Regions:
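Glycine/proline-enriched, intrinsically flexible loops and inter-domain linkers
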Residues: 1-386
């Protein structure tokens, strides 16, 4: 299953503001734990080939209550409009604080000094690398002027949201992480982290196209064929994904997930309001053509984009240029023919979007889509290079 979402941002808050030297760097949210330390090492491996220690280290553990508290603080800051105390903000994802804080400073062409002892942790005995690199959820990093700190502290106290000032911005583009009285755990120039790394070169051979063999239809049973086709996830009803949960939360859903007088078919797209006072909103649709990718990944990529756009038509968009795509590229990278299939899918999507005048500003790659069991020489299931849009 693939899940996605859409959001909106006030035009006044869409650009990060400069971070002068002395700006406070704050961690907002819960403490760090030994979570996600498998990180990219685990996500780059096929299911079934991981070591138990790596599986445990890479697993994520969510805390919805903490996420809600953090979100309420951010919402309160956003509601201040031009008086928003947040100068710049990042969510903490892959790489943990070791990625989020340096990116925050680098975006402002600055450096930063961090006090390792100020970073909140929930487990004893964590090494500096574990504290700095763990991927615990429900955390954000932000820059705030020193004089605005009392306001942020008051908001966090009201919402019972943990926060900690863990560093300051410096003019020198240098990154330092140290605990008082201890040698620095990190002491490097920002250029080492953000310098131009060499591009990865991959070569993949395009396999020869094989024509589908002719089929003897005389022995096929129509009922059996219909049942098999209707069981295909790309064809079957998706209603079970809706009926297992609440249809709407918050009262801003305009288009009910199910349509028609008996509420049986699933709607082509989702439509939600931005607030309770106006009639502006967002529409969200999806497209995927997995069966077509078996024969032609480029065609499947174009079909997925076409499906997402035609599903969106029921919301009657004013202009196609208002549409933004998010593509999830999926493949079993490295296996025979899959690198070439993925390249063809990306190239086809790029050319089509250029012709249509739309862009794919965001997305995700899932390039270890394979599962194996009974060892490396046993059974294997793999993904075909394609795109979800």
């Amino acid at each position: 299953m693939i899940a996605g979402g859409v959001g909106s941002v006030d035009a006044r808050h869409q650009h990060k503001l400069p971070l002068p030297a002395g700006t406070l760097l704050v961690q907002l949210g819960g403490p760090g734990m030994r979570i996600g330390l498998g990180g990219g090492a685990a996500s780059s491996m096929g299911v079934g080939s991981n070591a138990a220690e790596l599986d445990f280290a890479s697993v994520q553990r969510a805390n919805p209550e903490m996420e809600r508290r953090v979100q309420e603080v951010i919402n309160a800051c956003r509601a201040m409009g031009d008086n928003n105390p947040i100068l710049s903000i990042h969510d903490v994802g892959a790489g943990g604080l070791s990625n989020a804080f340096p990116e925050l400073a680098h975006d402002a062409d600055k450096g930063a000094d961090f006090d390792l002892s100020r970073i909140p942790v929930a487990e004893s005995g964590m090494s500096p690398a574990e504290i700095w690199c763990n991927e615990s959820q429900e955390r954000y990093v932000l820059g705030i002027a020193p004089e605005r700190l009392p306001e942020l502290e008051a908001l966090c106290t009201r919402e019972r949201c943990p926060m900690a000032v863990v560093g300051t911005v410096t003019d020198a583009e240098h990154l330092k992480l140290a605990a008082p009285g201890e040698p620095p755990a990190v002491d490097i120039d920002m250029s080492v982290l953000f310098g131009k790394s060499p591009k990865l070169r991959r070569e993949g051979a395009t396999p020869a196209r094989t024509e589908l063999p002719g089929m003897d239809l005389s022995e096929l049973n129509l009922d059996t064929l219909a049942t098999q086709i209707l069981q295909l996830p790309a064809v079957a009803s998706k209603s079970f994904l809706i009926t297992i949960a609440d249809r709407t939360v918050g009262g801003l859903s305009v288009r009910d997930p199910m349509v028609g007088p008996w509420q049986v078919p699933v709607a082509d797209c989702a439509v939600g309001l931005l607030d309770y006072r106006n009639h502006h909103g967002d529409a969200l649709s999806m497209g995927e053509r997995s069966p077509a990718a078996v024969q032609d990944s480029a065609a499947a990529s174009r079909l997925a984009i076409a499906e997402s756009l035609t599903n969106l038509l029921s919301a009657v968009p004013d202009d196609l240029g208002q549409t933004k795509l998010s593509a999830n590229w999926m493949a079993d990278a490295g296996s025979a023919g899959q690198d070439a299939a993925l390249y063809a899918a990306v190239e086809a999507a790029s050319r089509l979007c250029i012709e249509l005048g739309i862009s794919i500003p965001v997305g995700k790659d899932s390039l270890s889509m394979r599962a194996r069991w009974k060892g490396d020489d046993g059974q294997r299931v793999k993904e075909i290079g394609r795109a979800h849009v």
